[in-house]
Amino acid sequence: MKLAVQHFSHSSEIDIRVWESLENRIFYHQANFSDAEGYSVLKAYLEQLDQQYGTQGNRLFYLSTPPDYFQEIIRNLNRHQLFYHEQGAQQPWSRLIIEKPFGVNLETARELQQCIDANIDEESVYRIDHYLGKETVQNILTIRFANTLFESCWNSQYIDHVQISVSESIGIGSRGNFFEKSGMLRDMVQNHLTQLLCLLTMEPPSEFFSEEIKKEKIKILKKILPIREEDAVRGQYGEGIVQDVSVLGYREEENVDPNSSVETYVALKLFIDNPRWKGVPFYLQAGKRLPKRTTDIAVIFKKSSYNLFNAENCPLCPLENDLLIIRIQPDEGVALQFNCKVPGTNKLVRPVKMDFRYDSYFNTVTPEAYERLLCDCILGDRTLFTSNEEVLASWELFSPLLEKWSQVRPIFPNYMAGSLRPQEADELLSRDGKAWRPY
């Protein structure tokens, strides 16, 4: 375990004294999820450790398990009194972390929530989305609401469109069984990309607290218009070359149906029906086996309307759209592109870029997303965790599209591993006179 910590830690080295104090408090207990007796033994073992080390009975249960076991584990933890239902300032606490997926559609999400409601208090549930633990994602609200430069033009009057892109060069690896039940829309879009969209578009909360932020995100989710089938593209990679390595197509991967209709790429065009965003298209894309690993948000502003820079007055001034790029991974940071005069006697205008990177500006190591989120859970801070209302509102948006897709068998594969995306995804934007930004 020490070697693993050394390998994955962002810190340059581990303080051996700190590690030894932690190592002596790590214990392993094995049981079967379905074995009722195992939970009784676990309860007795935890109580023994409480007495031995004076840990006062605090419990954090992290269900990093196959989602099929969530409800069974939750019921058994409650049945064997491993959850506390009366938690005050001077009393021990019990908390539950659940990994996505939170259901596979609206119906199953409601079933999971019914199980949660019957067994543990909602305030003790932490639905983890590791994207919300990334430093740049947390910075979105600060960029927006702490800077008049951006918030004053953060609306349909000045913004042409927005692109949110998640590109992964990897395939599904050994996750074939899981991915066959999920697909890219459930695995990435319904949660990660939707959370980014909410933070990018929500109204300012009355206070910078967990519940107020969640209220504004839910309002946005409920204002997203139903997704039209013609505004959604799905794809699946075939064999190809990624970073000079030949790779299999999705249907040839381990534990994948050779005739699978599961999507490994999704592109969507969404609209938000409120005064701030009316008419602004939001383009979302996420895919596997693309050329490189990157996640970013691009806010594309409208071109200047001043006649000073039209073709007649300034033929050498082909203005580009101003851009705000929020890089989530790799190289977390923010870049601003704007038009500037080229030095010299001619009236030449070219786009230039100002680029901020966390690792070069701040003399500190950015913690891993999970590191921040686990710490918040221990402290009882739910700000960066997803609420049940957000989960259900998101499924209300995407479940109808998934149902439509299930009724029509797609022609797959429709993009090569290592290529940019399916042709249909390019056409989704070209119909609007736009194009995807480079990864």
From Swiss-Prot:
One CC-aspect GO term: cytosol
Descriptive protein name: Glucose-6-phosphate 1-dehydrogenase
Keyword terms of this UniProt record: Carbohydrate metabolism, Glucose metabolism, NADP, Oxidoreductase
Enzyme class: oxidoreductase
GO molecular-function terms, A-Z: glucose-6-phosphate dehydrogenase activity; NADP binding
The keyword Oxidoreductase appears for this protein: yes
GO biological process: glucose metabolic process; pentose-phosphate shunt, oxidative branch
